[in-house]
Structure formats: structure tokens, C-alpha cells
């Protein structure tokens, strides 16, 4: 398993579509807290997920959201 950050960006008028799209998608990300910048005008959402591949990480998202999401493989390091 690898860890990924999923960074999604959408237009201000798409917030409702993004969040509603999860209702028809089975995902462990539903009903979980995550970081967003919608209320401050940024209209981005970030998730940190563990998955076997980039494709598996994107499958956690509804297609509409996944198509507007970048995936970055990350790891934790201790800052000296």
C-alpha cells in the first residue's frame, strides 16, 4: 500500500455537484472529515488515502470528482 494525497479543484458553482456526487458512490471517504477551501473561496478538497495504485486511489472518488483530481504519492518524514 502507498499513501496518496488527492487534490480536487472545482469552480465555485460546482460545490453542490461535487458533494452530491458522493451520494451515488460507495466509498470509505463518505461521511468522513476532510480539508476543503470552499468556504474561504479556494474550492479545493484534499484527501489522504492509502491505496495499492493511483487508479485505486481515484476509484475512491465519484467519476465527476476523480476527473478533476490530481494524485500525488507521499510519505511521512520526521522534520529535524
Which residue ranges define each predicted feature?
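Conserved, structured core segments of small domains
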Residues: 1-80
Amino acid at each position: 500500500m502507498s499513501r496518496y494525497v488527492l487534490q480536487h479543484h472545482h469552480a465555485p458553482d460546482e460545490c453542490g455537484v461535487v458533494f452530491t456526487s458522493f451520494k451515488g458512490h460507495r466509498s470509505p471517504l463518505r461521511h468522513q472529515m476532510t480539508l476543503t477551501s470552499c468556504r474561504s473561496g479556494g474550492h479545493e478538497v484534499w484527501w489522504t488515502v492509502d491505496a495499492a495504485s493511483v487508479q485505486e486511489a481515484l476509484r475512491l472518488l465519484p467519476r465527476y470528482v476523480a476527473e478533476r483530481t490530481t494524485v500525488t504519492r507521499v510519505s511521512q518524514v520526521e522534520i529535524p
